[in-house]
Structure formats: structure tokens, C-alpha cells
Amino acid sequence: MTKTNKIIGIDLGTTNSCVAVMEGGEAKVIPNAEGGRTTPSVVSFKGDEIMVGEIAKRQVITNPNTISSIKRHMGEANYTVNVGGKKYTPQEISAMILANLKKTAEDYLGAQVSEAVITVPAYFNDAQRQATKDAGKIAGLNVKRIINEPTAAALSYGVDKGDKEQTILVFDLGGGTFDVSILTLVDGTFEVLSTSGDNALGGDDFDLRIVDFLVQEFKKENSVDLSKDKMAMQRLKDAAEKAKKELSGVTSSQISLPFLTMSEAGPLHLEYNMTRAKFNELTKDLIDRCLAPVKRALGDAKLDIEKIDQVLLVGGSTRIPAVQDLVKNELKKTPNKSINPDEVVGIGAAIQGGILSGDVKDILTLLDVTPLSLGIETLGNVFTKLIERNSTIPTSEKQVFSTAADNLPAVDIHVLQGERPLAADNKTLGRFQLTDRPPHRAEFLKLKITFDLDANGIVSVKAKDLGTNKEQKITISGSGALKEEEIQRMIREAEENAEVDRVKKESIDARNEAENMIFHTKKSLEDLKADVTPEEKDKVETQIKELEEALKGDDTALIKEKTASLTKESQGIAMKAYQKAQEKQAQEKGTQENTTAKNEKPQDEVVDADFEEKK
């Protein structure tokens, strides 16, 4: 089979997946072998046979070796599923789905496919994105780009809408997750302003409400618990999903399941006329749950509802009339439904693939954002942010730090993700060390920390000793998995604990400043003992003792007061230290000039020199 240079687009969904490709200047969804334009994200094992898609979905309840919704566990370092004594990671199960989609594309194109763009939820963190790339690699795909699902959706709409300036809200209610993103389209550039969502809300939950209701009704009428009958539950689940879909177009759906189970008296049948009103009643709380992420996304973007120009519906569950009514009533906009919501993300991924391969010339730029802040732990358990939450990616930030103590042989770099001021309250992404360092005084050691966040949302952290130019680097992967619930919990806790955190951080900063002042003052007293009068020394040492005593307590105001007193009292000593340093520098310069004159080199010979990088 010949190899194609086309880059396919894949929407790897929790419940269903979709593959598309650019052909003749437009994105086309590729039907699978059964003719379906989407493929269930389900894998089933039967002996040595591995089944993917619709055939696997039909065995979800009856075959215990059937895996569904594996996407919920992407990025979880220790999560595996056990099938016949063999353990599979989420990446391996996802790779089986991706391999199936890859084959679908190859059968359609008649050529070997090796490159893809894969979409992920906007809230996916570094570990989850890396796991998705790994799954692609296992499936034999070089993942050229990971893009956010709402961005892909906006891209698919945006190709037809031109570059008119607008603010877009993407309402993505899929089979297993719910995401809200707000984007702007200006001069052909999409920029994500904010993202929010609920990782435990989707079409599956709506199906389950119908199933649970029918189980209860059947038990009332027949005194038989269907939940203990796997075959009956499989039929119920299929019937519930069918009824839900029908109720999007009609006001009632007849659920008819003859010979559903057996009793002592003989076979039992289920007949129920599910109305849209009853369905709305059963799922009202699920509809209401859609509101909070919408409000949070608007708040994060600092926008009023009136500023939203367009609402895009993504995900099959947005066909539910009550969902569309919620959007109309709360956002005061008639949602855009011009593209099939099951296919819109896959189409956007294919367009991005076309941009990368050169098939699409009218390029729309994508500017995604990172869902949480990134940084490191600094003295006193403080979380120092280098990349702020909702920063546009790709991005790179660097900052120079000094160490807290002299002669450290190694420096531990603790990489974190979150929104709280204290390191312990945030999520650890990884740790690494800068080792084998020569003895240095703390004030002379400078470390440059660089964070690089690539277009896929994957972070690399580099530490460089500016004295020795020694570097150490880490690319964060699997161990730092965050679920959407964790992200939303972190954001919520950051808001709820803002004042408590401010007080804690103020206390830590005051202590750090005090300890730093004591250290440098004692050092100056030692270095300048020949130049400091006994009276000056006594006054400064008294202030040091008072500050050290204050540090034993928790009175931040007192610590600040005593630090200020010590600073004022030691100003004379500090001035002497500065003058002495200036004199020493002048002497060294004179000696150097004298040596240079004696050993003058030809003009064209290179001479090493120190330099200071200006920022």
C-alpha cells in the first residue's frame, strides 16, 4: 500500500469517535465498515479476538471483558483494566480505537496513513495530553498536533464564516463529558479566552435515568429486579438510548421489549410510552448542571452574556430539546446547529490536519489556552507561578531565582500546577534536581528556570545554573494526571480560600524577608568587624535578637515591624559593605589593566570575557 501525505483528523471521544480528512478543499467524514459516520469508543475482548466499535458496544453489559469510556482514565499513571489476566493501560485501549479509525481512513483513501491530528477536551492537563499522544504512537500514528475539542469545533464553523470579528461560546455536551469554551475570532485568529466543564456529565447519564426509571417501574409491576439480569439490562440500555434520540424529534417514544426476562409464571414483557415531558422530568437536574460551567466560563473570560455573538452546539446530546431551550433561555441566543454536532470536532481536526499538510491555504490560526497555572515551589512552601492559567499556548516563560542557603550540592526543582498560593495545596507534576554544583554563597548563585508549553499543551521545564551553565531538563508526563473534577475543585478552592491564602502568604513572605535580613546582617557584621564600632554592633545585634524573638511567634505585623527596625539600624553597616566592595572592585580593575598592558595580545586574537545578559 502506498503512503499518503494527508494528515487525518480524529475526534477521540468518550462515547463515540470520528475520523475525517481533507479532500478537494473540504473536510469529509469517513464512514466506518458498518456505514456509520461515528464509531463507538468501545473495545471488547473475546478469546484472542479484539472487537472495536458497534460490535463491541452491543456487548457492554453481557461481556465483562468489554471496555467503554476509557477516555475518563487517560493520564492516570496507575490505572489499568484486567482482561483475561492481562493488564491494559488507558493508552493501549485508546490505541485500539485509534488503530480502528486509522484502518477506516486507509480503506477509504486506499493508502497508508501515518499522521494525525487528535482532539482532546480543553480541560485536559499535560499528563492526559501526553497519554493521548502515546496512544496515537501505539496505534502507528505520528500525532502532529493535539488540539482542544471546542477549538476544533469553532474551526470547522469558522472556515465557512470567514474572518468576521466575533466572540463564540462552544457548548459541547457529548456522551461522557460536558465542556464550555469561549473563543474570539479576530483577523483569522481563534483565541480561547476561557474553558470550563463537568467531566461526569454526558449523554450516558441521560440514558441511565431512563434505564433506572424503567427498572423501578418494572419492579413495581412484576416484583422482578431487572438490574440483576445482564441480558435484560443490555436491551434496556439500547432501548433507552434509542428513546432518548427519538424524543429529540417527537414528543413520545414507545419502548417495547417483549420477552425481556422470565419469572416463575413465564416470560415477562416491558411496554412503556416515554413522553418528552417525562424524560425532561427525569433529567431536569442534569440539565441544570449545565449552567454552572457556562457561568464559570463567562466569569473567567470577564464577559457578559450580551457579548456572546454566537453559540455553537457540539456533541450528540445537544440535540436534546431541553438542552437547546436552556441555551436559548440563558444565553439569549439561538444556537448554531448548521453542522452535525457528532461530526463537527472531527471535521475541525481534519481542517487542522489540512493546515499542517498544506492542503488548506486560507489558514485560521489557533490560539489555545492552558487550564491551570504552572510554576515551582520556592522558599517557605510558596507556589511561584511562571505561566498563568488561561495563558495562550504555545508559550515560554523564564525567571531567575537564587538559592536559600550557601553551598548546596544540589537544587530540587518541584514543578506544580494549580491556583493556590501555597505549593502543598497544588498538584505536583514532577521533580528533578540540578546536581554536582560547586560551593557557592547563596547570593551569588543564580538559577534560570524556563517553562516551555508547546502547542499540544505539554510542558517542559529547564533549570540552568548561570554560574556553571549546567542544565537539567524534564518533560512532564503521566504521573501528573488531573481530572476535570480536580481542576474545578482547585479553581473553586482558590476562590473560597483567597483571603486565608493571602494571610498565609503574607506571613511566609514576612518570615522569608526577616530571615534573609538576619542572614545578610550577620554576614556583614562578620565581614566588616574591623570597620564596625562596638556601639554600632551592639545596636544591630539587639535588633537581630528582637527579630529572632518575633519569628518564634505568629504575629506577622510584629515581624514586619522588627524587620523594618533592623533594616534601618543596619543601613550604616550596609553602606560600609557597599563602599568596601567598590574599593575592592577598583583595585581588581587596576590590577587587571596592568596585567593586560604587560601581556597585550594581537587585535585579531579572541579573548574570553564575562558578560551580563540584559533582559
From Swiss-Prot:
Induction: By stress conditions e.g. heat shock. InterPro entries: ATPase_NBD, Chaperone_DnaK, Heat_shock_70_CS, HSP70_C_sf, HSP70_peptide-bd_sf, Hsp_70_fam. HAMAP family: DnaK (MF_00332). It holds the Pfam family HSP70. Residues 605-615 have a biased composition (Acidic residues). Residues 567-615 are annotated as: Disordered. Transmembrane segments: none annotated. It comes from the Bacteria. The modification Phosphothreonine is found at residue 177. The keyword Calcium does not apply. SUPFAM superfamilies: Actin-like ATPase domain, Heat shock protein 70kD (HSP70), C-terminal subdomain, Heat shock protein 70kD (HSP70), peptide-binding domain. GO terms for molecular function: ATP binding; ATP-dependent protein folding chaperone; unfolded protein binding. Keywords: ATP-binding, Chaperone, Nucleotide-binding, Phosphoprotein, Stress response. This is Chaperone protein DnaK. Acts as a chaperone. PROSITE patterns: HSP70_1, HSP70_2, HSP70_3. It comes from Onion yellows phytoplasma (strain OY-M). PANTHER family: HEAT SHOCK PROTEIN 70KDA. Belongs to the heat shock protein 70 family. Residues 581-591 have a biased composition (Basic and acidic residues).
